[in-house]
Every structure is written in C-alpha cells, then in structure tokens.
Amino acid sequence: MAEKLDDAARAKAVASLADSGWEDVQGRDAIHKTFVFKNFTRAFGWMTQVAIVAEKMDHHPEWSNVYKTVEVTLATHDVGGLSELDVTLAQKMDRLAQ
C-alpha cells in the first residue's frame, strides 16, 4: 500500500516536478498540471495512453479534457495526500506528452 510522503520527501518531489510544470494545489495535498496539445486527437490519444498506464499502476488521475487541453490533479485518496504513486504517474505523464 502507498504511504503519504513526509514533508521533506514531498518538498523534494514537488521541486523535481516543478520544472515540467507541476504545481501545488492550494488547500489540498495534491499536485496539478495543465497539458496543452496540438489538437483534440492528440489530447485524447495521450489520455488513452495514460489511462492504460494508470490502470496497470491501479492509480487513477483526476482529470478533465476540453478540446486540446487536459487538466490533471494527482493525489492518493487512500493516504489523504501525495504518495510516490503520484510522483511516478506525473513523471510517466510527462514522458508520454513529449
């Protein structure tokens, strides 16, 4: 089972993801990023790839899609905040978006 990141691990994880656009969610132990693609097909194709990865991880994002933009929030509900699962999924999302 996942464990909530302690303050030091959380700060390190968020700092490592900040360069690629991930940000803290105000008032919540979560991270957020806006992905913008060339068009709807690319956005939806990326979401499909991420869905397969997320299902294999048994860790699912909160997300929404409007045309070529995908808003993503990551947190581990079972632990009430960020876990290593969120960091790993964020990194995989970034790689798939390249």
UniProtKB/Swiss-Prot annotation:
Output the GO biological process annotations, alphabetical, semicolon-separated.
Answer: tetrahydrobiopterin biosynthetic process
Q: Tell me the enzyme class.
A: lyase
Identify the Pfam families for this entry.
Pterin_4a
Q: Name one GO molecular function term.
A: 4-alpha-hydroxytetrahydrobiopterin dehydratase activity
**Keyword Cell cycle on entry:** no
Which reactions is this enzyme annotated as catalysing? (4aS,6R)-4a-hydroxy-L-erythro-5,6,7,8-tetrahydrobiopterin = (6R)-L-erythro-6,7-dihydrobiopterin + H2O
Quote the EC number: 4.2.1.96
- Keyword flag Lyase: yes
Listed SUPFAM superfamilies: PCD-like (SSF55248)
Report the sequence similarity comment from the record.
Belongs to the pterin-4-alpha-carbinolamine dehydratase family.
NCBIfam families for the chain: PRK00823.1-3
Name of the featured protein: Putative pterin-4-alpha-carbinolamine dehydratase
